[in-house]
Amino acid sequence: MGNSNSKSVKNDKENFEDPNATNFESVSQFKIRNVIGKGSWSTVFVVKHRQTKQRFALKCINKKKHDEHKIKKLRNEVLLLQSLNHPLLCKFYSEFEDETKIYLVTDLMLGGDLRYHISQRKFNESVIRIWMVELVSALIYIHSKGVLHRDVKPDNILLDEKGHCKLADFNVAAKVHTSSSPSKSNMTVGRVGTPVYMAPETLIHAVSYKESDWWSLGITFYECLFQVRPFPNHLLINWIRASEEEKASSADRLSSALHISRDKKLTTISKDARSAVMAFLEMDIKKRLGHSSKKLQTHPFFCSISLETVSKGNLTPIFRPKSGKVYVDPILDLEATF
């Protein structure tokens, strides 16, 4: 989890709680099924609630592997998740714990992540347009709540069984600072996220704004179109690893390398898609697509789809994951222990 000086949001139960949901207080309320995700500090299981028979994702975090600072950040993440409620966010239901583990109950997203799908095949612009407009809706919503995601990338975008894209994994998300100084307001401090998706202002100046999320979406958009990222991995990773003195001496070179306008791949897509990609990957945050929500919603690539329809989850996706297919690595079940 990344560093942040931001305060967590307060729990807004009135806005969050589903009146039809069961109150989850113990892992004994669930039947544990197969593993769908495994990280260095957590394992995610498919579970079925014994009473309602509903299926959920249960993330199990081992307390022994983390110090108090990391556990505190996790609890702040939970508070933030409880304040968000939108059809295109992976819904958070409950958090509880026992002596050794912390458990998070969320929506079960059986369609896999976007990374899996774009690595398997090339998709046309019509499919990608729907993905992007759903993510636009999700980002507009969290930004309206003063939240920056700070790690938008295909790995953190999950598909449900109907093919809807949902923004997930808020482990480095943060509330923006509020300050009487315009230069320090609506931002967070620190190089947080995944280097190859970080915006220039995050890489160079170690700050993030809402526009930084739009840059990351632009990289994701490009990757959906071409199955590769626009900028060399080594360039960005080496920058992160460099000393502050080295960063200062090479900032201009990095800034020059992050210009998308000369990319020949962009000539192979539609004019509207090309315009959107280039606008998301604009160096100047005040000119970047997303700085103005009105310009974003009226952009030619997106304007044919009503954001009101999208924000209610009523858009019908073109691509739908195959029913019954499990988009996870089967070896996970062999490696995981509960």
Swiss-Prot record:
GO terms for molecular function: ATP binding; protein serine kinase activity; protein serine/threonine kinase activity. One of its GO terms (biological process) is intracellular signal transduction. The active site is at residue 151. InterPro entries: Kinase-like_dom_sf, Prot_kinase_dom, Protein_kinase_ATP_BS, Ser/Thr_kinase_AS, Ser_Thr_kinase_AGC. ATP binds at residues 36-44, 59. Residues 30-302 form the Protein kinase domain. Residues 1-20 are annotated as: Disordered. PROSITE patterns: PROTEIN_KINASE_ATP, PROTEIN_KINASE_DOM, PROTEIN_KINASE_ST. It catalyses: L-seryl-[protein] + ATP = O-phospho-L-seryl-[protein] + ADP + H(+); L-threonyl-[protein] + ATP = O-phospho-L-threonyl-[protein] + ADP + H(+). Its EC number is 2.7.11.1. It comes from the Eukaryota. Keywords: ATP-binding, Kinase, Nucleotide-binding, Serine/threonine-protein kinase, Transferase. It is an enzyme of class 2 (transferase). SUPFAM superfamilies: Protein kinase-like (PK-like) (SSF56112). Belongs to the protein kinase superfamily. Ser/Thr protein kinase family. This is Serine/threonine-protein kinase ppk33. It comes from Schizosaccharomyces pombe (strain 972 / ATCC 24843) (Fission yeast).
